[in-house]
């Protein structure tokens, strides 16, 4: 009996649905869809409009948003199985949850917090209205989940996963990206790319400014664009974003335009460490002296079958450089742009 209890996935906390409906009633948003199904959302305040945006987003792509949310908690293995072991461990290794919880209040301003909360509140409303599509334990969605989602995913846009995979031998190379790229179009490597650039009036024949928005993303999945138009008394933006992201990360307004692209700048440093024990390292050499690793624990569950999952407990090591990975080729510390950055 103890073994069965040990393997049974913990029951989700009881959800206060009335509270979710009460919170939703404080927002006022209108969603109008054009002939292509693109939502045009109108609200008095930025939070009102973002609430409508979050609801429309959930209507159109709930399953992907749900996958992003469980990834942003480091819990994909509990729902998807052992193929997500590496990514859940990396989530804990990078201490995403700790960074968001410790920096949310101080690193994000009140207006942005209101927008993030509105998006999370909209996700909760849609979910309680469509409970048959919601995995156990996903609700309620919090502001921390939303921020953790893009804090966790951002480094993979400049191919941190490719850098990490190089640490492993070709025979033992894990899939470390939090999500598999998905697309309806399989292009040869030679014609893949992503770019964005601006042309100033001084460099155009007709003295007009041009912004070329040409980021190449999959047709579906967590890296696919979602198009929307959001209007409040203070903003009027049309553009696109990713599942689980409460703002348009590329687009236009009556006064400006902005874009982004996926590329591979030099934003990752990997340090090969001299350690006291390659199999069970507890110290590393730095500036001619031995230093103890900062040690904590990664804990998550891996789906088995039905209501059962297996608990995983694995050590997490940090050096002065950053998080530490033990690979067949050695022990490495990683420092990269965006590590534990919030806001």
Q: Regions from the language model: what does each represent?
A:
Residues 1-343:
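Mature extracytoplasmic enzyme cores
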């Amino acid at each position: 009996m103890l073994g069965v209890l040990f393997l049974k996935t913990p029951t989700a906390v009881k959800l206060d649905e009335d509270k979710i409906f009460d919170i939703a009633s404080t927002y006022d948003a209108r969603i109008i869809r054009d002939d292509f199904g693109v939502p045009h959302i109108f609200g008095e305040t930025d939070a009102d409009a973002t609430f409508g945006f979050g609801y429309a987003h959930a209507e159109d792509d709930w399953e992907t948003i749900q996958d992003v949310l469980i990834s942003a908690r480091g819990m994909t293995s509990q729902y998807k199985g052992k193929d997500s072991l590496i990514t859940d461990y990396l989530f804990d290794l990078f201490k995403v949850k700790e960074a968001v919880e410790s920096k949310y209040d101080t690193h994000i301003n009140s207006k942005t917090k209101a927008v993030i909360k509105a998006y999370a509140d909209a996700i909760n409303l849609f979910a309680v209205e469509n409970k048959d599509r919601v995995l156990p334990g996903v609700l309620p969605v919090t502001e921390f989940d939303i921020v953790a989602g893009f804090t966790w995913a951002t480094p993979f846009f400049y191919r941190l996963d490719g850098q990490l995979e190089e640490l492993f031998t070709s025979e033992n190379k894990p899939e470390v990206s939090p999500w598999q790229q998905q697309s309806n179009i399989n292009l040869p490597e030679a014609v893949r790319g992503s770019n964005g650039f601006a042309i100033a009036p001084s460099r155009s024949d007709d003295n007009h400014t041009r912004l070329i928005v040409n980021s190449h993303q999959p047709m579906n999945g967590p890296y696919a664009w979602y198009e929307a138009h959001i209007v409040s008394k203070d903003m009027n933006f049309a553009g696109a974003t990713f599942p689980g992201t409460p703002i348009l990360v590329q687009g236009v307004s009556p006064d400006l335009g902005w874009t982004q692209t996926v590329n591979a700048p030099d934003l990752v440093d990997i340090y090969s460490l001299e350690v006291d024990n390659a199999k069970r390292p507890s110290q590393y050499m730095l500036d001619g002296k031995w230093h103890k690793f900062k040690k904590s624990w990664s804990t998550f569950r891996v789906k088995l079958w039905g209501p059962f999952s297996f608990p995983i407990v694995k050590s997490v090591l940090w050096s002065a450089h950053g998080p530490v990975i033990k690979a067949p080729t050695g022990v490495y510390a990683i420092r990269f742009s965006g590590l534990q950055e919030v806001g």
